[in-house]
Amino acid sequence: MVRERTKKLRGGHYGRGMKAGRGKGKKGGRGNAGMGKHKWIWMVKYDPLHFGGKGFTSHHLSTPDVPINLGELENIFENLKADGFVREENGETVVDLKAAGYDKLLGSGNFSVKSRIIIDKATEKAISKLSAIGSKIENVGNTAE
């Protein structure tokens, strides 16, 4: 007796009719298609990191400057002296604003103590007011108005 050959229906046309399924359309059940729609539960459980990763990340460190005005410096001068940020070196008063946590010296107000001030940044107005009374500024990286 001859055994009949079993049809395994492995071709691409089976279950779709004669002409359906010839093109590349209607592939919603294959691969990763539909992961955001009808396969969402599988995606959330087995591949939770599939979606995402969009957006913008700023990689430069941008910390805002901590400013101090000349008038404010005049007001807190005694407190800075008590905290050890004002010292005497070779008969000269040295004010270390950088160590006190300030980054920029602004020119509003007046400062009357002839001294040497250590700070990273200072405005042109602050520099001109201090040079008028004979003070000096050290470690000024850039001057901006």
Curated annotation (Swiss-Prot):
Residues covered by region (Disordered): 1-33
Name of the molecule in the record: Large ribosomal subunit protein uL15
Function summary: Binds to the 23S rRNA.
Comp. bias (Basic residues): 1-13, 19-29
GO molecular function, one term: structural constituent of ribosome
Pfam family, one: Ribosomal_L27A
Assembly information from the UniProt record: Part of the 50S ribosomal subunit.
Record keywords: Ribonucleoprotein, Ribosomal protein, RNA-binding, rRNA-binding
GO terms under biological process: translation
Keyword Ribosomal protein applies: yes
HAMAP family, per database record: Ribosomal_uL15
Gene transcribed to yield this protein: rpl15
Keyword NAD assigned: no
Similarity comment: Belongs to the universal ribosomal protein uL15 family.
InterPro entries: Rbsml_uL15_N (IPR027386), Ribosomal_uL15 (IPR030878), Ribosomal_uL15/eL18 (IPR021131), Ribosomal_uL15/eL18_sf (IPR036227)
Cellular component terms per the entry's GO annotation: cytosolic large ribosomal subunit
Stored SUPFAM superfamilies: Ribosomal proteins L15p and L18e
